[in-house]
Amino acid sequence: MSVPVQHPMYIDGQFVTWRGDAWIDVVNPATEAVISRIPDGQAEDARKAIDAAERAQPEWEALPAIERASWLRKISAGIRERASEISALIVEEGGKIQQLAEVEVAFTADYIDYMAEWARRYEGEIIQSDRPGENILLFKRALGVTTGILPWNFPFFLIARKMAPALLTGNTIVIKPSEFTPNNAIAFAKIVDEIGLPRGVFNLVLGRGETIGQELAGNPKVAMVSMTGSVSAGEKIMATAAKNITKVCLELGGKAPAIVMDDADLELAVKAIVDSRVINSGQVCNCAERVYVQKGIYDQFVNRLGEAMQAVQFGNPAERNDIAMGPLINAAALERVEQKVARAVEEGARVALGGKAVEGKGYYYPPTLLLDVRQEMSIMHEETFGPVLPVVAFDTLEEAISMANDSDYGLTSSIYTQNLNVAMKAIKGLKFGETYINRENFEAMQGFHAGWRKSGIGGADGKHGLHEYLQTQVVYLQS
């Protein structure tokens, strides 16, 4: 029996062998086999990485932005060269289907190239002064050392979402991947090492969030911590960062509503909502978690929805290419989904499809449709993060908007209608960072991914996401 590979960290331009005794097993969620081990890193490891990033930052910032962009393009080229290898790692450690893993890797390379294009485009300002002979200059400066704490659902892309704008604008970064999906991050670090990126500009630390994450947020040398994860984890990061008044950028949970109007294209709505719910086995914070259907089409829509969900195939993504879903990430995730469905049933919901975990190896949960659901049920308010879809009927658009907004979360929302006036009313009424009209919930790199309320602070992507990594210096120049 082969011994699982033991991965090192990447600090100050070197792969660092772990000298500690404690290791964390990385498990294939499709088979429950241990596929690798990573160090159970401690705060001291994070401090070393932060110190390396601090040493490297002034010289990195001094480079012209276009030169920093050229390094990003070398990274994206390396990703494309290793695309098949990286996709396989994502499938193995994350349970993601092959097609989605391939999309994630390709999108990551494209995203890095997109951010590199901003090298000549982010600007300061010259402002008219009230004083004779004075110029007011606004410069955009790097923050300094930044840190990125990643989730496991889109682990490879999230490296780029934090690293690319940080490095492009003259910051350095320390990345901590999820302990459930670290192998793809090791592959990323190997690319960084192979292209010869200056030491300390990019660092990778491995371990648990509750130990390393606290140092990445609480170290006084850190200028900004960017985290993607749960609300509870975000609260801890925010509290720790507050001790040094450190800037935070948080993308947290979601409970995305999808509103289906009487005049909707039902074929489009059903396909988009099902695709949005089963993608990555429902483990996506911005995809539809609850559906509101106007009463005039409720029966017809629910019948079509049930047929579409029944047709969804799932299994081991390493063995099958004809599936739309793999397993959930781990045993704890499977148990949480089971508990949320059980509670919904206790509160009066009816399981129309699915509703029971699959027996045997792997953390599989089938597409599940819940009917006879009421707005006050917990399943309409708590994030499920699994392939479970509760459906509620409504009379008027105003009622649907009111129920959609009745949430602690405010990340994404969607509406299906062929009436422009209805769509515009929904856009104005829905209190979410993103609203999708007649399409699945998946953002664009040139947009801005940002949640309201408990879904987060700050945002990512596009011009506005780039500016999260900049601070403004004002100069009053009297001649």
Each predicted region: which residue ranges?
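Hydrophobic face of amphipathic alpha-helices that form TPR/SEL1-like repeat modules
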Residues: 1-30
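Conserved C-terminal structural/oligomerization subdomain of aldehyde/semialdehyde dehydrogenase
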Residues: 31-37, 222, 259, 357, ...
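Residue-level signal for inorganic ion chemistry
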Residues: 32, 68, 90, 112, ...
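Glycine-rich loop-to-alpha-helix module at the N-terminal edge of alpha/beta enzyme cores
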Residues: 33-122, 133
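Short, well-ordered beta-strand elements within core beta-sheets of diverse protein domains
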Residues: 35-41, 56-62, 147-148, 258-261, ...
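Structural signal for hydrophobic packing residues in well-ordered secondary-structure cores
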Residues: 57, 61, 76-83, 87, ...
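Rossmann-like NAD(P) dinucleotide-binding subdomain of oxidoreductase/dehydrogenase enzymes
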Residues: 124-268, 322, 394
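ALDH superfamily catalytic-core signature
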Residues: 232-374, 437
